[in-house]
């Protein structure tokens, strides 16, 4: 907890004591499961605080809307940390590997999270009965693949939230004409080596009246 408090001082985030306890508990659960199921290449719990917890929750101030889906979530990143500090928002966490979804289900039970829905599916095959205000991805795919594979999940007013390292103009150039970059935000992740960016993308709305 002391390490987490130290890291949080270098951000604008103000989680409650219960939320901080749950973030630490999530790290302990991930570390425990990782020994048996190899869920992440990060082995040190202190490193997990920086590379998985802080790297996820710094996105929180930029989320717009109430219902989100984290595609290719892996062991619930960034979805689980974001769900912990945003109890008023709903998060669907999608992955195609059973061991990852099993971990997420266990974490949801252990942490008593009521705003997380684990989904075992490939993103192209997932057909929900509603769309989402935001589609999140972290180390999932290129911007082009993310937008094309996930476009059926997003409302017309929603945003794609892509967590990236160094900003890559080639990825932007490869985007379909249906999508545009709305914002590129440089993220401050305390003690993380290397740059992190949040790329916000949206669908381009075509006014059919212009063609009549």
Curated annotation (Swiss-Prot):
MF term (GO), any: rRNA (guanine-N7-)-methyltransferase activity
Biological source species: Histophilus somni (strain 2336) (Haemophilus somnus)
Sequence similarity: Belongs to the methyltransferase superfamily. RNA methyltransferase RsmG family.
Catalytic activity as recorded in UniProt: guanosine(527) in 16S rRNA + S-adenosyl-L-methionine = N(7)-methylguanosine(527) in 16S rRNA + S-adenosyl-L-homocysteine
Name the UniProt record assigns to this protein: Ribosomal RNA small subunit methyltransferase G
Alphabetically ordered keywords of this record: Cytoplasm, Methyltransferase, rRNA processing, S-adenosyl-L-methionine, Transferase
Subcellular location as annotated: Cytoplasm
Stored NCBIfam families: rsmG_gidB
């Amino acid at each position: 907890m002391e390490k987490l408090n130290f890291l949080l001082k270098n951000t604008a985030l103000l989680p409650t004591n219960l939320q901080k306890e749950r973030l630490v508990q999530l790290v302990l659960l991930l570390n425990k499961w990782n020994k048996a199921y190899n869920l992440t290449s990060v082995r040190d719990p202190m490193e997990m605080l920086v590379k998985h917890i802080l790297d996820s929750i710094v996105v929180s101030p930029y989320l717009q809307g109430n219902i989100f889906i984290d595609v290719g979530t892996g062991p619930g990143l960034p979805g689980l940390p974001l769900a912990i500090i945003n109890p008023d928002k709903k998060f669907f966490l999608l992955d195609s590997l059973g061991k990852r979804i099993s971990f997420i289900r266990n974490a949801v039970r252990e942490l008593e999270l009521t705003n997380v829905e684990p989904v075992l599916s490939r993103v192209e095959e997932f057909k929900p009965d509603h769309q989402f205000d935001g589609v999140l991805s972290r180390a999932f795919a290129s911007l082009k693949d993310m937008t094309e594979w996930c476009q059926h999940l997003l409302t017309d007013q929603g945003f794609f939230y892509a967590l990236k390292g160094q900003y890559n103009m080639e990825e932007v150039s490869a985007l379909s004409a249906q999508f545009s970059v709305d914002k590129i935000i440089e993220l401050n992740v305390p003690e993380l080596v290397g740059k992190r960016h949040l790329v916000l993308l949206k669908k381009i709305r075509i006014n059919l009246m212009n063609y009549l």
